[in-house]
Every structure is written in structure tokens, then in C-alpha cells.
Amino acid sequence: MVYMDLNSDVGESFGRWTLGDDTAMFQSVSSANVACGFHAGDPTVIRRTCREAVQAGVMIGAHVGYRDLSGFGRRFVDIDPSELADDIVYQIGALQALAATEGARVRYVKPHGGLYNAIVSHTAQARAVVDAVKSIDASLPILGLPGSEVLRLAEAAGLRAVSEAFADRAYNPDGTLVSRSLPGAVLHDPAQVAEHVLRMAADSAIRTVDGSILRINADSICVHGDSPGAVAMAVAVRAALSDAGIDIRAFA
């Protein structure tokens, strides 16, 4: 049977501030990118998120990012690569400990926001991420954009590189994501998102902002949990894939 992994960013609440409906998202996705406290999340939120993921049978991954709570980790940070590597190790270690208290373990790593976008082409930061992951557990896959520098370096280092696509994001013709600062960068219509995902999963292709078709091979598809209507989009995506005979299953 053909299958696809659906992942979502979760655990991004902080203290009395709540973001997204993680409990509802867990009913549709197979993998959870859990914030590790640097761009969002706190120890209580992280542990609760791990508990709910375990209860829902959803795989846990470390959603690591820049140390940038006020910017939600979406801004580029010009950080020394060795310091970035230490920050990544710190975040993965924190999630590993909190996941263990709920009888779970971290199964993969996905960089977040500004860091995710930077390491598409920023070799020094991409290498810092790869070195950090390898120093902790060389069996941890790294999730990233197809053709990115971080996935190239991960493969070269003997790590598993997992390509992902985004259900609710618009693409440039070169395969990069349209900047969130531009109109139309984030898709909000569940039907449009479902069609977008079906093209990715069934045809290994996406329609870019200029109307051209780009070939893309993705092992996982991300549905952002903090977008307006995120739960409805996740439900629509899962239903569309199921109707097309595509099973939803974690990639690891």
C-alpha cells in the first residue's frame, strides 16, 4: 500500500499563552514536531504534548530552532555555528528527557522556522545542525526541504535525510517556500490544501506561484498547527489521501 507521513508543529504554547489545538491535530497526523523551548514551549507544555502524542499513537520529533522566543524562531539569527550546535544538542536533550517520562523517545529532528529556511543554503549552520544530531544519536533522521544543504550534509555524514513538503505553503519555482511576508504565502482553504497535497503524494509534483509544475519527492507532508483553520485543513488532507488509497503512517 502507498503511504505518506503527515507531520505538524505542536507544543508551541507557553505558560498561560496557548497556540493551536494539538489534541485535535493528533487525530489527523502521524508525526509531531514538538517545540523544545527555544522558539516556543515550556517544560510543562512539552511533557503534556509528549503524553498526548503517546496516547494518540503519534511519533515524536524534536522541533529545534534559534533561541528566539519573542520572534517565535522565525527570524534569521547570525549565530556562531559551534554555539548553534550546542543549542541544538540542548533542545534535543530536553525533549528526550521529557519524552522519556511519558514512556516515549525522540525519533527524528526537524529544524524550525528561520533556522529551517537558513539551512536550505547556509552551509555553516546546516553543518552545525548535522553535527549536533550526529553527536547525540546518529540514528535520528533529519527532516528538511528537498535539495537543501542540510539534507545533503546529513546524507554525507551517514544520517537519514527525510524530504518533506508543506500542505499549506506556497512554493517558488526553485522549490523554496514563498516568504511569509508576501501575500499568498500561506494557504487557508482546506479544499485547495487537499488538492495541493494530493498532487504532492500522487504525482510527486507541486504547482508553484507562477503556475509552473515542480517535481518533488516527499516522504512527509507538514500541516502547520498554528494556521487559522489548521484542524479543518488536517482533517481535509487526511480524508483526501485516504480517499485516494494513500495510508497515513509515520516515516520512522
Curated annotation (Swiss-Prot):
Family to which the UniProt record says this protein belongs: Belongs to the LamB/PxpA family.
BP GO terms, sorted: carbohydrate metabolic process
PANTHER family: 5-OXOPROLINASE SUBUNIT A, UNCHARACTERIZED PROTEIN YBGL-RELATED
Name used for this protein in its record: 5-oxoprolinase subunit A
Keywords from the UniProt entry: ATP-binding, Hydrolase, Nucleotide-binding
Biological source species: Arthrobacter sp. (strain FB24)
HAMAP family: PxpA
Catalytic activity, EC: 3.5.2.9
